[in-house]
């Protein structure tokens, strides 16, 4: 009998073999500028962003509920898109050290802007969503965001992914969304 014939096939649901995750795609529109950028991204401009958020169960993605899901897709949409709509959609993302942009945006009435603890690059936006937003809005659903992809264009994206235990995350400086409805 050959060695191949004596090997046992792994069980269909062996957690050492199968890891389950789900990805929810979200879309929003926002403007930004990149502080100290050497080219045209230093100007105020906007994008139709797409965000892909991948989540696994807190158990590592090896278990599902009685329906067979990690979590219902609609819960990811409700929580994450709700946050995006409230904070970033149709607003400007401004780096907290960009005094010129902050002064300019405050002159426009009404206005909506979100102050970030770092330059609002696609990389930093993905990082912020992964490290700050997802743990706060998804934490009680029994899932952990493992990866966030922020698409600025159909051809260009940035990826932030967890490489360690989610409990090791440190929260960056507090950020704030500011909406001024005065006319």
Where are these regions (language model features)?
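Charge-rich, low-complexity N-terminal segments
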Residues: 2-183
């Amino acid at each position: 009998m050959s060695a191949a014939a004596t090997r046992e096939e792994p069980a269909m649901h062996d957690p050492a073999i199968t890891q389950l995750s789900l990805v929810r795609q979200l879309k929003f529109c926002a403007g930004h500028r990149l502080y100290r950028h050497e080219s045209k991204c230093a100007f105020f401009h906007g994008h139709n962003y797409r965000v892909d958020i991948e989540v696994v169960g807190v158990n590592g993605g090896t278990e599902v509920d009685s329906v067979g899901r990690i979590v219902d897709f609609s819960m990811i949409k409700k929580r994450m898109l709700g946050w995006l709509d409230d904070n970033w959609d149709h607003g400007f993302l401004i780096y907290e050290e960009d005094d010129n942009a902050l002064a300019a945006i405050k002159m426009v009435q009404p206005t909506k802007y979100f102050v970030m603890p770092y330059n609002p690059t696609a990389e930093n936006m993905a990082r912020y969503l992964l490290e700050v937003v997802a743990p706060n809005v998804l934490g009680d659903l029994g899932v952990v965001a493992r990866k966030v992809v922020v698409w600025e264009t159909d051809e260009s994206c940035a990826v932030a992914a967890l490489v360690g235990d989610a409990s090791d995350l440190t929260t960056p400086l507090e950020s704030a969304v500011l909406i001024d409805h005065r006319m």
